[in-house]
UniProtKB/Swiss-Prot annotation:
The lineage of its organism: Eukaryota, Metazoa, Chordata, Craniata, Vertebrata. The record marks N333, N459 as: Not glycosylated. Residues 209-212 are cytoplasmic. Ca(2+) binds at D35, D36, C75, D342, Q343. Its EC number is 3.1.6.2. One of its GO terms (biological process) is female pregnancy. The chain crosses the membrane at residues 185-208, 213-234. Residues 22-184, 235-583 are lumenal. GO terms for molecular function: arylsulfatase activity; metal ion binding; steryl-sulfatase activity; sulfuric ester hydrolase activity. It comes from the Eukaryota. Changing W372R: In IXL; loss of steryl-sulfatase activity. This is Steryl-sulfatase.
Length: 583
């Protein structure tokens, strides 16, 4: 046989082998995100009283990141950064106003259609993709059926969960997250109307001023209208905003908390079982442990930390079910699993009965909605038995934005070249090929405001953190903004610092002792480098539409989703009650 003809079969065999080898090297990817879980809650991060054996098992079988940072201390912007590998301010997913998360399903704001998620990249590489649980990145733009922000328009083949978030208002008897705001928007106008009525009545009775009867009726009508709108909003909020979806269809409105974690677990397990022969991406986004807190009968009252501990332990059980399933299907060695939280624990969450409904941020100051370490330092666990050595601990600064380039590279997907990607590939750190994080600088945003800069200089163990402003805790001396339920980012809610507050996080992780020129000889030199880095960073920020503008944020009736039902109740339950997984 001529040599040229002999080469052809060998070349074909080589290319076939290369293709099969590439497919075999691409792992399944499971990204697990808790909601408002503090770094001090899991046992593997030091908690001795909440039982998290399955999260701990994940950590002992892989790598535990001790300085893993959320790109934002709030749900919506943090999740946008996680999905895109970019600071949320780059996509308009960071608010310039008081409210930094979406509160209505019928808002037009959301993750822009031109943003590229890791789900899009992996779907293009042949991965089957699913999001189970919480989305909170918007739904529709112009009509209720355009679904421009829906998970299925951002790279996911399958969606089962909630489009908004879990809120107190979603569970009867748990109060409302709007109470504080309504004190200004509702109660203050009512007080003004009431005082005006009494004053006019007194003047009229004393004969000092003649007030037509129509004025009294008008003021009474205005007060009744304000009160009616307030009560109507609270009454209809739950069915209009708290519902379960499967892909584009509402299947339960309002959603039921009965065995909700079990239902999410069943959906995740079924997705894995459907994709044992093809690579898959599963984002399992728990509703735990955001309020309203809940748990099934098997976990209620079983922990040492009330309903919060019950919820954490139920979530841990669910993680264990996924790990056990991977073992049963012999997929564990070929699956990269990542576990994290979208931000730190919400320390201001206290029930009307005085029970603590927020978690623990361990030794760290602050919590959700601020950039003290307690608000942004979150659990970060990765396991891939075939590649990552078990039992490691990495203290280098990493970000939840790093997941985007990491999974893209593992899937063989090229990174977009038409935009800045702020995340960095974690694999050199995880495989021990590098001892240093690729992040020399990280920037911490309070909504859309640049709040702080973190600098890890080369050839140094120091990790400097400079605050341009800090939240005003209330009461003074507490560890949170209890008067407003979360900390805000501007005006009288913050204190600006000139020069910035400077800490060495490597020596003072509790952020108790700000440095001074007397205690740090290079004080001004360090701040100069950090300010220059911040200036360079802000110059890379494009002008983009604000997804939290009043126009995008407010409720729009023509965008309201409602399942077909009799009357105007927006109530239905098409959810098939799957048999609960045994504990």
């Amino acid at each position: 046989m001529p040599l040229r003809k002999m080469k052809i079969p060998f070349l074909l065999l080589f290319f076939l082998w290369e293709a099969e080898s590439h497919a075999a090297s691409r792992p399944n990817i499971i990204l697990v995100m808790a909601d408002d879980l503090g770094i001090g809650d899991p046992g593997c991060y030091g908690n001795k009283t909440i039982r998290t054996p399955n999260i701990d098992r994940l950590a002992s079988g892989g790598v535990k990141l001790t300085q893993h940072l959320a790109a934002s201390p709030l749900c919506t912007p943090s999740r946008a950064a996680f999905m895109t590998g970019r600071y949320p301010v780059r996509s308009g997913m960071a608010s310039w106003s008081r409210t930094g998360v979406f509160l209505f399903t019928a808002s037009s704001g959301g993750l822009p259609t031109d943003e590229i998620t890791f789900a899009k990249l992996l779907k293009d590489q042949g991965y089957s993709t699913a999001l189970i649980g919480k989305w909170h990145l918007g739904m529709s733009c112009h009509s209720k059926t355009d679904f421009c922000h829906h998970p299925l328009h951002h790279g996911f083949n399958y969606f089962y969960g909630i489009s908004l978030t879990n809120l107190r208002d979603c569970k009867p008897g748990e109060g409302s997250v709007f109470t504080t705001g309504f004190k200004r928007l509702v109660f203050l106008p009512l007080q003004i109307v009431g005082v005006t009525l009494l004053t006019l009545a007194a003047l009229n009775c004393l004969g000092l001023l003649h007030v037509p009867l129509g004025v009294f009726f008008s003021l009474l009508f205005l007060a009744a209208l304000i009160l009616t709108l307030f009560l109507g909003f609270l009454h209809y909020f739950r069915p209009l905003n708290c519902f379960m979806m499967r892909n584009y269809e509402i299947i339960q409105q309002p959603m039921s908390y009965d065995n909700l974690t079990q239902r999410l677990t069943v959906e995740a397990a079924q997705f894995i079982q459907r994709n044992t022969e093809t690579p898959f991406l599963l984002v399992l986004s728990y509703l735990h442990v955001h309020t309203a807190l809940f748990s099934s009968k098997d976990f209620a009252g079983k922990s040492q930390h009330g309903v919060y501990g019950d919820a954490v332990e139920e979530m841990d059980w669910s993680v264990g079910q996924i790990l056990n399933l991977l073992d049963e299907l012999r997929l564990a060695n070929d699956t990269l699993i990542y576990f994290t939280s979208d931000q730190g624990a919400h320390v201001e969450e206290v029930s009307s009965k005085g029970e603590i409904h927020g978690g623990s941020n361990g030794i760290y100051k602050g919590g959700k909605a601020n950039n003290w370490e307690g608000g942004i330092r979150v659990p970060g666990i990765l396991r891939w038995p075939r590649v990552i050595q078990a039992g490691q601990k990495i203290d280098e600064p990493t970000s939840n934005m790093d997941i985007f380039p990491t999974v893209a590279k593992l899937a063989g997907a090229p990174l977009p070249e038409d935009r800045i990607i702020d995340g960095r590939d974690l694999m050199p750190l995880l495989e021990g090929k590098s001892q240093r994080s690729d992040h020399e600088f990280l920037f911490h945003y309070c909504n859309a405001y640049l709040n702080a800069v973190r600098w890890h200089p080369q050839n140094s163990t120091s990790i400097w953190k400079a605050f341009f402003f800090t939240p005003n805790f209330n009461p003074v001396g507490s560890n949170g903004c209890f008067a407003t339920h979360v900390c805000f980012c501007f005006g009288s809610y913050v204190t600006h610092h000139d020069p910035p507050l400077l800490f060495d996080i490597s020596k003072d992780p509790r952020e108790r002792n700000p440095l001074t020129p007397a205690s740090e000889p290079r004080f001004y030199e360090i701040l100069k480098v950090m300010q220059e880095a911040a200036d360079r960073h802000t110059q890379t920020l494009p002008e983009v539409p604000d997804q939290f503008s009043w126009n995008n944020f407010l409720w729009k009736p023509w965008l309201q989703l409602c399942c077909p039902s009799t009357g105007l109740s927006c109530q239905c339950d098409r959810e098939k009650q799957d048999k609960r997984l045994s504990r």
